[in-house]
């Protein structure tokens, strides 16, 4: 909004026709699902969802959510001998059977993907385990999902009275596959960064942004920095100086597209 206010206050600054959009549900993966791309009327867009100054990102994880449901047999513990099938224990065994020294967020970096159990709700009779599965390459992502499926089927299948449900929900695609046909969108962002005296930092996002979904829907949308740090933690913070730099880059970006 600082960039928009600056452009509004300085009509002499060159700019093309600009559109500004806000997506309130980005953190739950729904920020761009219902975004009116056609009504927005832009040829390209840029999200401001990065961290360090200079970040310019045109590649993300492909993300899916895997949900396991396990139904056991819940009976009174006083006469449970030979009858009780504890869904909570089965869920724990599935998690224990997954890799712990590899293929986790805390043991991977760079271009490595992972499987991340983030929620477990369990009782003796019913358990739900939710996991995020991430990778930059579709074939490797499918391998990770298959590993989870096979592990769950082996563990739960060892108890014939238990029942397993397995659901895979697509969350966002790697925007690289949709941006590679629009190199000008990225090169003009590089020009805007350098106009602010910042050298572009090209690193893939170990996560996703609304630009992933928007790019897949036909609106090429790379990501720029905002100066935020320690995202998704209780220590999340932002640098005011970096935020000001991000706003200045947006102004330079408008100028870069005005010269189209």
Map each language-model feature to its residues.
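Metal-dependent amide/peptide-bond hydrolase catalytic core
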Residues: 87-260
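Acidic-glycine-rich active-site phosphate/pyrophosphate-binding loop
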Residues: 57-69, 191, 222
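Short gly/pro/ser/thr-enriched loop/turn and capping motifs at secondary-structure boundaries
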Residues: 52-55, 76, 230-232
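Short, solvent-exposed amphipathic alpha-helical segments in soluble enzyme
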Residues: 36-40, 62-63, 85-86, 146-150
